[in-house]
């Protein structure tokens, strides 16, 4: 599936028109995750659909969802901008950025320098770079380009093999372990537990996917995660603010 998405991206890049520069303040994604509101930093994801789950949110109002996340004390937001597979759009990110005061991560399949430039222009504070989608040297090149644009990077891996190849080239400040198997789409928090042992101690570790309950939060924290990225389990709730409180065991419905 990832290969298919990358091929689509390559085609999209051929026709990519760069938007006007958004006049919005840059906010540090790294600082927000390093100084969390709770025991773990929360990156709450604004996501309408996905290839594995189909449509997640029918009445999709990205700005309202983002505001509800901020009210629930999310430390940062992640916004899907991939149109073809996730029904996202770059305007969702630009619109959200106008209405919240927390940093916003652009969640997309970034494989080319023009997309880094595009991310900066639409107002992103950080971008996702996927270890399985890029050769380590290419990933490092995009990472450095992002830094020049004052963009932080969440560098995501799905396997120990990818992490080791990456660390042989350079050490990203923020490393995400995605708990979803790229071939089966199944999630297992064991991924975080196993791979976390090999992440250098000074790096900020994010556990992504498959986090639904407070027990899951505790499990990945115990494994060494300093932050979590949660999308689907929050998006499926009617009230995103309450959903965050429930996830962290703060509401009366938590147990």
From Swiss-Prot:
UniProt catalytic activity: 1-(2-carboxyphenylamino)-1-deoxy-D-ribulose 5-phosphate + H(+) = (1S,2R)-1-C-(indol-3-yl)glycerol 3-phosphate + CO2 + H2O
GO function term, MF aspect, one: phosphoribosylanthranilate isomerase activity
One GO term of the biological process aspect: L-tryptophan biosynthetic process
Keyword Translocase: no
Entry keywords, A to Z: Amino-acid biosynthesis, Aromatic amino acid biosynthesis, Decarboxylase, Lyase, Tryptophan biosynthesis
Keyword Chaperone: no
Gene3D superfamilies: Aldolase class I (3.20.20.70)
Entry-linked SUPFAM superfamilies: Ribulose-phoshate binding barrel
Recorded superkingdom: Bacteria
Name this polypeptide is given: Indole-3-glycerol phosphate synthase
EC number: 4.1.1.48
Pathway: Amino-acid biosynthesis; L-tryptophan biosynthesis; L-tryptophan from chorismate: step 4/5
Family the UniProt entry places it in: Belongs to the TrpC family.
HAMAP family, sorted: IGPS_B
Top EC class, one word: lyase
């Amino acid at each position: 599936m990832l290969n298919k998405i990358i091929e689509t991206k390559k085609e999209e890049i051929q026709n990519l028109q760069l938007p006007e520069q958004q006049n919005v303040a840059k906010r540090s994604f790294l600082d927000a995750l390093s100084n969390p509101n709770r025991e773990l930093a929360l990156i709450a994801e604004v996501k309408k659909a996905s290839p594995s789950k189909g449509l997640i949110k029918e009445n999709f109002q990205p700005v309202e969802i983002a505001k509800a996340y901020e009210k629930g004390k999310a430390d940062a937001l992640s916004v899907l901008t991939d149109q073809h597979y996730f029904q996202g759009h770059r305007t969702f990110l630009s619109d959200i950025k106008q209405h919240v005061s927390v940093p916003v991560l652009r969640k997309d399949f970034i494989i080319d320098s023009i997309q880094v430039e595009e991310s900066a222009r639409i107002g992103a504070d950080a971008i996702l770079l996927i270890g399985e989608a890029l050769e380590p040297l290419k990933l490092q090149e995009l990472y450095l380009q992002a830094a020049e644009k004052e963009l932080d990077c969440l560098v995501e891996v799905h396997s120990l093999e990818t992490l080791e190849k990456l660390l042989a080239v350079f050490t990203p400040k923020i490393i995400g372990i995605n708990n979803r198997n790229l071939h089966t789409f199944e999630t297992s928090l064991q991924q975080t537990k196993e791979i976390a042992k090999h992440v250098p101690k000074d790096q900020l570790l994010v556990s992504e996917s498959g986090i639904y309950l407070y027990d899951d939060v505790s499990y990945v924290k115990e494994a060494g995660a300093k932050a979590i990225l949660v999308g689907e389990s929050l998006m499926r709730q009617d009230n995103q603010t309450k959903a965050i409180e429930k996830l962290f065991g703060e509401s009366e419905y938590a147990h």
